[in-house]
């Protein structure tokens, strides 16, 4: 059991028959009354975020979460096939389980698959930055490197983001998966 006084950002708990990851927490000791802990929790099954206040000192059950490094090897209809990088076993995940991550997934990408009690898939963890190919963008004109203007670019996954005018079709760029923003050109082509 985990005491609410031992809460840390990133810890996972089982609460109300759901699995939550602690996003934020704050210990509050008011002048009158007993202390409490305000938390912001993400449901790992649904992705929804809730605010919940625990009384200080109560105990909650920890959730047994494991992360396994896997590589997306191919897509077959509505299923994404991942390979464990340690033992080469393959795992098939339906696109509906991948939700918001689809816009960043491409063949060859390494991700962490998150399991609850070693058998239930509750999500994936993307790298903070990924290198991805530009599938389409309007051509840039000569001298476009001098301004801070942006244009739309469609990436190989179908995601549309804003990029500088000097980026061309076929180039690899680095984007932040948390914000979805362009970071730089990938010079390691």
Swiss-Prot record:
Task: Please name the GO terms of the biological process aspect recorded for this protein, alphabetically.
Answer: peptide biosynthetic process
**What GO molecular function annotation could you give as one example from this UniProt entry?**
translation elongation factor activity
Compartments annotated for it: namely: Cytoplasm
Task: Please report a single Pfam family linked to this protein.
Answer: Elong-fact-P_C
Q: Which InterPro entries match?
A: Elong-fact-P_C, NA-bd_OB-fold, Rib_uL2_dom2, Transl_elong_fac_P/YeiP, Transl_elong_KOW-like, Transl_elong_P/YeiP_cen, Transl_elong_P/YeiP_CS, Transl_elongation_fac_P
Q: Which UniProt keywords apply?
A: Cytoplasm, Elongation factor, Protein biosynthesis
The lineage's top-level taxon is: Bacteria
* CDD domains named in the record: S1_EF-P_repeat_1 (cd04470), S1_EF-P_repeat_2 (cd05794)
Outline what the protein does: Involved in peptide bond synthesis. Stimulates efficient translation and peptide-bond synthesis on native or reconstituted 70S ribosomes in vitro. Probably functions indirectly by altering the affinity of the ribosome for aminoacyl-tRNA, thus increasing their reactivity as acceptors for peptidyl transferase.
Task: Identify its protein family.
Answer: Belongs to the elongation factor P family.
PANTHER family cross-referenced by the UniProt entry: ELONGATION FACTOR P, ELONGATION FACTOR P (EF-P) FAMILY PROTEIN
Name of the protein in its database record: Elongation factor P
Species source reads: Aster yellows witches'-broom phytoplasma (strain AYWB)
């Amino acid at each position: 059991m985990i005491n609410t006084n031992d809460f840390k950002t990133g810890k996972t708990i089982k609460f109300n028959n759901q699995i939550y990851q602690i996003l934020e927490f704050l210990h509050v000791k008011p002048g009158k009354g007993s202390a409490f802990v305000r938390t912001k929790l993400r449901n790992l099954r649904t992705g929804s975020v809730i605010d919940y206040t625990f009384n200080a000192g109560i105990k909650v059950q920890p959730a047994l979460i494991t992360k396994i490094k896997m590589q997306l090897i191919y897509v077959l209809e509505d299923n994404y096939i991942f390979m464990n990088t340690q033992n080469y076993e393959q795992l098939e995940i339906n696109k509906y389980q991948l939700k918001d991550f689809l816009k960043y997934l491409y063949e060859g990408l390494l991700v962490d698959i998150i399991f609850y009690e070693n058998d239930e898939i509750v999500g994936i963890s993307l790298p903070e930055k990924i290198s991805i190919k530009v599938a389409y963008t309007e051509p840039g004109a000569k001298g476009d490197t001098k301004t801070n203007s942006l244009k739309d670019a469609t990436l190989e996954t179908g995601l549309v983001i804003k990029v500088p005018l000097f980026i061309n079709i076929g180039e690899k760029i680095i984007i932040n998966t948390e914000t979805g923003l362009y970071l730089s050109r990938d010079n390691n082509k």
